[in-house]
Structures are given as structure tokens and as C-alpha cells.
Amino acid sequence: MPVKREQNLKGPALKPFFVRAAYDKITIKTRYLLCQLKKFLYICGCFKLSDMKKKESPNHLLPHYYTDLIEAGCDEAGRGCLAGSVYATAVILPPDYDNPALNDSKKLSEKRRRELRDQIVRDAVAWAVGIVTPEEIDRINILNASFLAMHRALDQLKVRPQAIIVDGNRFTPYQDLPYTTIVKGDGKYQSIAAASILAKTFRDEYMDSIAEEWPFYDWKRNKGYPTRAHREGIQKHGTSPYHRMSYNLLGSTQLEMKFED
């Protein structure tokens, strides 16, 4: 399985189609049509990243790790929670994409994350969400559940990636695709940051919805994480069907679990 080391690539700008200064002045509708054209040409392989002029990304997040490959960024949300499913997202961005606001979802406000989600969904070449339930987490453990959620997201992409980059330091191979794990990748690469934002916002909405049915655990605020209010709710009212029973729900730490590679 080929695994590529991290490189200091710069953000690309597509020169065959427009000059940047002129692009900034055109209408939103024309800009959208150009974006759709670039997506189509990228998917069809009509140009490569090496054919594009490289430029520094204003937010210092790099657009791509692999050169000349259709690349999907992956990240998960909810791994450290006591309750709820784990969500993962895979995102393929256009080859010259540059959104200065993208960052690790944990560093953004809830309002900003929702605004960025709309932009990512609009602009992405492809994106998809994978979900693993609490019952599955208890059966296979949270690490393997995180990998499974990413695989499920990749399965649902409408465009098949040629390479994968993943936030973190561990991953299980997906089909025959090359992949790279990147520690704190959601603060380094735009596609991982985009995946982080989608996974976080979709999971937060899921936790808000089940909080209506189970209001005892303060899920609207803690989203299932082990806060004092959450654990006091468990102590007073017992567990819900959404709790991960393989976790030490009332302790200060989670049960140690043997993770499989």
C-alpha cells in the first residue's frame, strides 16, 4: 500500500481559464459556472495539478497533499463522546479551491461552522457522511468504528478518489487507494478541514435531535461529551439507548479497550 510523506505544496490557481484579477470582478453566477466547469474538467482528467500555477494559500491551509490525483480528505466527530453515533465525512474539493475561512472545526464558532458547511456543500466536487451507531461502537470499539465511518463515507462519494488523506495518525486501508495520515491535518489541509466541519455540524444536529427525546443529559450543550452535567444525568436517570455501554460512563476516564489495526 503506497503511503506518501507530507510535502510542502502550495495552493494552485487555474491559469488557462481566467486571470485572478478579472475573476474577482465577475458576477456570482459566472463564478459559479466556472467552478462547475473546473469540477467537470478535474473529474474527467482534462488537466493536472502540475499544469496549474502554484500560489500561497492566504489561510496557510494547503489545498492538496498528493500531486495530480483526485484526493479525498477525511475526518470524524464524536470519538470521545459517551453517547451518540460517531460521524465521519469524506470531501473532495476542486483543484484550485481556496477558502481562507477553513480551519479545524474545533477552532470555529457554531455559527461560523454552519456558514462554512453551506459553502463546502456548494463548492465541493463530492462529499459524503458515514455513521456508526453506539451498538456498533460497543461491538468493535471506537477506533475501529471511526475507521468504519470513514470507509462508509468514502463508499458514498459520487466521484471515486485516487488518494486519501486522513486527520490523525492511524487508518485502515480503503480498497487499493494510497493514503496518508496527518496529525492535526484539519489545521493543515483544506479538504480535511472541510471534512472536520461537515462531520462536526451534522453530528451536532443529530445530538440536538435526540436531546429532545432525552433531555436529562444536557446533550444540546455537551453533544454527548463527558461533562459533569452529562454524568450527573446518567447517575440520576440511568443510561439511554444512545449511550456507549463499553465506556466507563460515570468514571473520570473511559475504559481501556484493545484497538485493532
Where are these regions (language model features)?
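Positively charged N-terminal leader segments that act as targeting/secretion signals
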Residues: E6-F17, A21, T30, F40, ...
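Intrinsically disordered, low-complexity segments enriched in serine/proline and basic residues
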Residues: A13-P16, G45, S50
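Short, positively charged and aromatic/hydrophobic N-terminal segments
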Residues: Y23-K25, Y42, K48
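Cationic, amphipathic, low-complexity segments that mediate targeting or membrane/lipid association
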Residues: D24, R31-L34
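Residues marking helix boundaries in flexible regions
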Residues: T27-K29, C44, Q235
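RNase H-like, Mg2+-dependent phosphodiesterase core
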Residues: Q36, K48-D261
